[in-house]
């Protein structure tokens, strides 16, 4: 596949914006095996339950499910294996310092292909309380009602 300048989003973590107030985002590279990248390019990846932890000064993506490649036979990968994220040392240090505070975690927001490489947009998020989620739902419903009213007004 030729390298292009465009990026194609393959997986979105919609649950992350509902459960966490995202304060900062960073783009990280993904270390994948041959059958993993083929499955990712087909869009067979799920990051709904995924999270990032640090082990020995490295950022590792846990619980990301990449489906088996159909033609991979015995060389297929393990679906739920931990995958290394490629970040600069300074980025890892700042993220480790941020996560050490109470209530903060790092979650993947998007998986996409950029210039032929698999990338992961990770976000530093603070967990939302139940009332925060309800407030967000109320705002979302109000915005939807306003948009609907404006759309109906433009029709007539």
UniProtKB/Swiss-Prot annotation:
GO terms for molecular function: RNA binding. It is found in: Cytoplasm. CDD domains: SmpB. GO terms for cellular component: cytosol. The keyword Protein biosynthesis does not apply. Pfam families: SmpB. Its main location: cytoplasm. GO terms for biological process: trans-translation. It comes from the Bacteria. Residues 132-156 have a biased composition (Basic and acidic residues). Residues 130-156 are annotated as: Disordered. Keywords: Cytoplasm, RNA-binding. Required for rescue of stalled ribosomes mediated by trans-translation. Binds to transfer-messenger RNA (tmRNA), required for stable association of tmRNA with ribosomes. tmRNA and SmpB together mimic tRNA shape, replacing the anticodon stem-loop with SmpB. tmRNA is encoded by the ssrA gene; the 2 termini fold to resemble tRNA(Ala) and it encodes a 'tag peptide', a short internal open reading frame. During trans-translation Ala-aminoacylated tmRNA acts like a tRNA, entering the A-site of stalled ribosomes, displacing the stalled mRNA. Belongs to the SmpB family. PANTHER family: SSRA-BINDING PROTEIN (PTHR30308:SF2), TMRNA-BINDING COMPONENT OF TRANS-TRANSLATION TAGGING COMPLEX (PTHR30308). This is SsrA-binding protein. The gene is smpB.
């Amino acid at each position: 596949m030729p390298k292009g300048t465009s990026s194609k989003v393959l997986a979105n973590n919609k649950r992350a914006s509902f459960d966490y107030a995202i304060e900062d985002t960073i783009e990280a590279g993904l270390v994948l095996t041959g059958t993993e990248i083929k499955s990712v390019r087909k869009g067979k990846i799920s990051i709904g339950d995924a999270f990032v932890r640090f082990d020995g000064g490295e950022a590792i993506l846990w619980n990301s499910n990449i489906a088996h490649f159909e033609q991979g036979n015995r060389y297929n990968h393990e679906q739920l294996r931990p995958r290394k994220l490629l970040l600069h040392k300074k980025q890892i240090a700042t993220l480790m310092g941020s996560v050490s505070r109470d209530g903060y975690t790092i979650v993947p927001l998007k998986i996409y292909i950029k210039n032929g490489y698999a990338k992961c947009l990770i976000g530093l998020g603070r967990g939302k309380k139940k009332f925060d989620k309800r407030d967000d739902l109320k705002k979302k419903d109000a915005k939807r009602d306003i948009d609907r009213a404006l759309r109906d007004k433009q029709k007539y």
